[in-house]
Structures are given as structure tokens and as C-alpha cells.
Amino acid sequence: LIDIHCHLLYGVDDGSKSLEESVEMLKIAKKQGITGIILTPHLRHGMFKHPLEKIERHYKKLMPYANKLGIELKLGTEYHVATDMIDAFHGGLCHTLADTQYILTEYSHSSEYSFVYKMTREAIFAGYIPVIAHVERYECLSDISRIEDLQELGALIQVNADSVLGIDGRHFKRYTKKLLKAGLVDVIASDSHGTKERVCNMKKCYEYVAKKFGDDYAQEIMQTTPENIINGR
């Protein structure tokens, strides 16, 4: 399995607090059968904004531990979308996913659909492929025809493993089930934040999706597509 969205990098957002915790999170990932991870620290104006130099320094410190466990580790960003998004990526202020053409975009719960659509289109025109993070959280996307419209534009749709499993609540489980049934999920990721709360549940989720929606689909959204993202295909 490959996890393209997690907060395993320590000391840069609301995820891992220390190198030790990050190493524990890597061990949990290994037990889940994860072979590749894209670290996606938050970048959000006025809330999470750490110098790239610090992010890259912590990444380098973590690398030997990942190598030892046989996990490929790449850098990315979970970018909370603002109007200067293209400048931020073009200007190298944050990492695309594994330094490919893919970017992980996040919105506010109350974002207007017109804004989500506009910024997704802007990213695509600029040469990026937006992966829209945890779509189940946005009120404006409760109508799944809007998910189809975003996919037609060229975006990929990501949901969280914990939402699929019902850990994040029944509402999210119902919504993600509807998306999975319609074949509208492109990627499932852990969005894990620690070792005690919001832990990685990718293995359990893979088994659930395979049982309910078929092995082929589980493989596509938790192995094949994430692998294409990490390799920039």
C-alpha cells in the first residue's frame, strides 16, 4: 500500500510532535503493509507555515529510519487553498506530491463550490493535477454530481481511511460509501496524525473496501493510483 497523505513529519504541524513519534508512526505503517509514504505537512496561512528548510531538515533526519524499514519516503504539502496557490507552487514555497505534477489541495469546511471549482481549474491550467483532500468534509460537495464535475476537469478525489471505516462518524461513512459505490473515489489515504489518535488504518480499510467493493477497486485506489502519483505518472 502507498499512503499519499499523512502528518508523520515531526514538529511542523498538528501531526507528529517528535522524531520518536515519527519513527513509531513509521513502524505502524510498516505493520499495515505500507511501502511508500508522501509526507504532507499542512501549509495554511495564519496557522501552519514552517520554513521549507526546517521541513527538509526533519525529512532528512527521518530518512534513515524509513530506509531501515523498507519504506520509500517522499515530501509533499497539504496546501490549504488560497488565491496565491499557483505562485506558492511555482515559486517553490512548498512541495508538490513527491515533486511531481500532483498537488494535495485542502479547503475550509464552509468553502463555496464556485471557489473549489475555480481553484481546481486554475491549478489544472497551470499544469498541475490537484488531488482534493478528504472531500467528505466539504459541505459544498455533498451533491456527488459536483464530484463528477471536478473529476471531469481533471482532479483526483481523495477520501480518508477513517471516514470509510466509520471512525470519523456515521455521516462520513455514509457519504464515502456512496462515492465508493459510484466508483468516484480515486485515492484512499490515512491522513494519520499520531500514534494514539488519528492513527493509520490503511490495512483495515483495504480489507473493508476489497470485501464490499471488490479486490480490483481496492487495489486501484490504494496501490495503483497512489503509485502513479508517487512516480509522477
Residue spans for each PLM region:
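Non-catalytic positions within long, well-ordered alpha-helices that form the structural scaffold/packing
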Residues: 30, 124, 180-181
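Metallo-beta-lactamase
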Residues: 7-16, 145-151, 159-162
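Mid-to-C-terminal alpha-helical segments outside catalytic/metal-binding sites
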Residues: 202, 206-233
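Short acidic/histidine-rich active-site segments
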Residues: 184-199
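Active-site beta-loop-alpha junctions enriched in small/polar residues
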Residues: 7-9, 42-43, 76-82, 108-110, ...
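An N-terminally biased module of ancient metal coordination in phosphate/nucleic-acid-related enzymes
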Residues: 1-70
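Extended substrate/RNA-proximal surfaces in nucleic-acid metabolism proteins
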Residues: 49-158
